[in-house]
Amino acid sequence: MSGRDNRGAGGGGGGHQPLSNAMGKLKEKLTRVGDELGYHRVESNLSTSNTATSLDTILPEDPFLFPQVSPQRHPQNTVRTQRLLEDEPPLSFRPLLEDDDINEPPTQQQQRTPLRASGSLELTPLPPPPTSLEIREHRDRQQRGAQGDELQRSKQSLKGSRVSFERRDTGNSNTNSNKAAESSDEDSFEEKRTGFQQQKATSVDHKGILKDLKHILANDNRRQFQAKKHVSLDVKGTRFLQDLLKESSSEEEFHKTRREFQGRKHQSLDPRVTFKLDKVLQGSSTDSDEEGEDAEHKRLIHRPKDITKPVIIDLKDLESESDEDFLTSRQHFQQQRSISTDSRKSRRLYEMDEMDNKRGENIRHAVPFVRQITEDGKPKLEVYRPTTNPIYIWTQVLAALSVSLGSLVVGFVSAYTSPALVSMTDRNITSFEVTQDAGSWVGGIMPLAGLAGGIAGGPLIEYLGRRNTILATAVPFIVSSLLIACAVNVAMVLCGRFLAGFCVGIASLSLPVYLGETVQPEVRGTLGLLPTAFGNIGILLCFVAGSFMNWSMLAFLGAALPVPFLILMFLIPETPRWFVGRGLEERARKALKWLRGKEADVEPELKGLMRSQADADRQASRNTMLELLKLNNLKPLSISLGLMFFQQFSGINAVIFYTVQIFKDAGSTIDGNLCTIIVGIVNFLATFIGIVLIDRAGRKILLYVSDIAMVLTLFVLGGFFYCKTYGPDVSHLGWLPLTCFVIYILGFSLGFGPIPWLMMGEILPAKIRGSAASVATAFNWFCTFVVTKTFQDLTVAMGAHGAFWLFGAICFVGLFFVIIYVPETQGKTLEDIERKMMGRVRRMSSVANIKPLSFNM
């Protein structure tokens, strides 16, 4: 034993220094590895009385850490190790948990139960070192926790008014942190911190809800106000520019002033300048005395409580909810707010789409947003610019007057049989016999020919052009009247009437198309009235001249009327749209210059025509007749056909064609020719009354009034003729037929005269409007032929009273048709009407806005 001890002691004297160096290196390396792996250093309180231990209770068994000092290799160094450990306590490491505070020692629960070694020394056993996968997972958790904290802080940060709250919140957080550091009860501290965070989130989101909902509501009211101001500002601007054009000494000065005006208007229309959001939120009353400000704008500024009241109610509802429901509502609100607050980038594009539906027909007079497609395919706002040039009216008046003279010829030809048939059946005047059947064909063949002309007119205006097609009817009108004037038999009269009716069918289709493609929208309503007015003038002229002339002289007058029409048609150009359709861009530009004025900028309008033509070419390959048979197209087409049916079967053309004969059969005490003149004057004046009321009272109201007036007068006329034939003497009531005819014509001209033609252009879908209008026009001429051809036969078979009662019964049925099926289109854009009829919207062409040629025939 002593020898072993001496050898050990002697060996220890030489080996103590290497072992001490090794333990120092071991301590440094373990400390460094523990810091890198996120381990926590724990100092063990060792008793100096512990005299024996083994190195394997201190060192990990991994030889990677220190292979040179393994207890298995050097068991003789155990005693020396015990002596060294009396001066230097060992190290113990464990994983750092998420709940640990690096500034505080571990709790009793976190410390492991010490294991007793072979001696009396108590040491904490070391866990095995973590693997590389565990190290990566631990670092990932730390990064995710840091990112989550950063994201939570960014979500809770608000703008503007919340800065002060965050400062107070920072102070409260520091106070709570100090209190938590001083608190020894960790669970109590966590409860306080959680409660504070919930209170902060609630108060912050209440403020956010109130502010952002105010912002959203203010934007809605602001968009409505801007939509109104677009119209008012541009109207004022247009008048200003018109006055400036008259007063300007030079063109350069005018354009310079116009550019300055557009710049000021661009600023005034900018939402950030015209309608500050803080005025609504703060309830500013500084603008209360400004003149000319919109009433809605004032109400929003002076009564902000109207906006915030529903928001406060919603906040009270939120406060009454449970914590879970409130958190759900808050999350939903945050999702909405992330969309609504990005207003600077998206607000204008959204407003453009919304205002397209609101502005409707007013888009011509407003200052619209102009979109430009960028390289990435997204639309962006480029500039504001006006849509129209200053109106150069005189050339457009000349164009409208030229085609309206053709309408005068149409009206004269249509009313020819009413005064002419009386003298034509008189054997003392006519050299040939005209039987009752032949007389019915003289009146009825013109509508039949008009049906054929309407069908042929569609291809002709596309092949020859609008102007050339109208011009081509002038010579046949002259020939037809000369053929009737020089007739020696009924066949010549019928040939002349057929040729005249064929030209009437072509003209009635081409005249509205020409006006719609040449006249600017600002004057289209006024100039669009000229064909209707001139058509009724032609009817009145025929009635007045027929009271002094026989049928032959009246026909010679009809041959002279187309001459000024023929001359003026040579002075006006073809429509620009037709030139664009033929690829003649330069000729289209010249036509626009003639119509709009030499100084006008016609390039924007020309580009619009080219885009419309491109859209039409893309749809040209479709079979339009098959499109008519689709269910969503049949409804508007059926309504249009129904209105045409009730218009003609009200008996209007029978009354116009046979007015003199009706008054002669009635035995009226008033001269028949004078009665026709009075009816013509009423027809002419009633047209203007209908134009004034049609956009004020509405379409359906006027149809109701028109139908009721016709039903009453037709039944009264039927009763008069019945009493004259079978009943008591009514000779003392000779004024009654004229009174009934005046009321009948007045009622027809208010409603069933112009409205079926107007609604045909409104309710028919854009893609089938051309073909559907041709079908409706042809059907109208067919009904006209049936009524005029069978009227005299009806009076023979049923008596005059039976014919008028039949027409009255049909009008009575038409009243229910209007009530049930006809929609109200007053004040609605063509897009809105089509959306209601078909459930979708497309861009409408300018031709769709015209009022078709309409006069009583």
Curated annotation (Swiss-Prot):
Compartments reported by the entry: Cell membrane; Vesicle
Catalysed transformations (reactions): alpha,alpha-trehalose(in) = alpha,alpha-trehalose(out); D-glucose(out) = D-glucose(in)
Compositional bias of kind Polar residues: 69-81, 171-181, 330-341
Gene3D superfamilies: MFS general substrate transporter like domains
InterPro entries: MFS_dom, MFS_ERD6/Tret1-like, MFS_sugar_transport-like, MFS_trans_sf, MFS_Trehalose_Transporter, Sugar/inositol_transpt, Sugar_transporter_CS
Modified residues (Phosphoserine): 248-250, 320, 322, 845-846
UniProt topological domain (Cytoplasmic) ranges: 1-392, 462-473, 519-528, 574-636, 695-700, 762-767, 823-857
Carbohydrate-modified residues: 428, 550
GO molecular function terms attached to this record: D-glucose transmembrane transporter activity; transmembrane transporter activity; trehalose transmembrane transporter activity
GO annotation (BP), single: trehalose transport
CDD domains hit by this protein: MFS_GLUT6_8_Class3_like (cd17358)
Compositional bias of kind Basic and acidic residues: 134-143
Inducing or repressing factors: In perineurial glia by starvation-induced hypoglycemia, possibly in response to TGF-beta signaling; dependent on the BMP-branch-specific type I receptor tkv/Thickveins and its ligand gbb/glass-bottom boat, which is induced in glial cells upon starvation. Not induced by insulin or adipokinetic hormone signaling, nor by the jeb/Jelly Belly-Alk/Anaplastic lymphoma kinase signaling pathway.
Spans traversing the lipid bilayer: 393-413, 441-461, 474-494, 498-518, 529-549, 553-573, 637-657, 674-694, 701-721, 741-761, 768-788, 802-822
Disulfide bonds listed in the record: none
Tissue: Expressed in perineurial glia of the outer layer of the nervous system that forms the blood brain barrier (at protein level). Expressed in the fat body (at protein level).
Stretches for region Disordered: 1-28, 62-202, 249-269, 280-299, 327-346
One Pfam family cited in the UniProt record for this chain: Sugar_tr
Extracellular compartment segments: 414-440, 495-497, 550-552, 658-673, 722-740, 789-801
Alphabetized UniProt keyword annotations: Cell membrane, Glycoprotein, Membrane, Phosphoprotein, Sugar transport, Transmembrane, Transmembrane helix, Transport
Function (record text): Low-capacity facilitative transporter for trehalose. Can also transport glucose. Does not transport maltose, sucrose, lactose or fructose. Mediates the bidirectional transfer of trehalose. Responsible for the transport of trehalose synthesized in the fat body and the incorporation of trehalose into other tissues that require a carbon source, thereby regulating trehalose levels in the hemolymph. Required in glial cells of the blood brain barrier to fuel glycolysis but not required in neurons.
Stated family: Belongs to the major facilitator superfamily. Sugar transporter (TC 2.A.1.1) family. Trehalose transporter subfamily.
UniProt protein name: Trehalose transporter 1
Species in which this protein is naturally found: Drosophila melanogaster (Fruit fly)
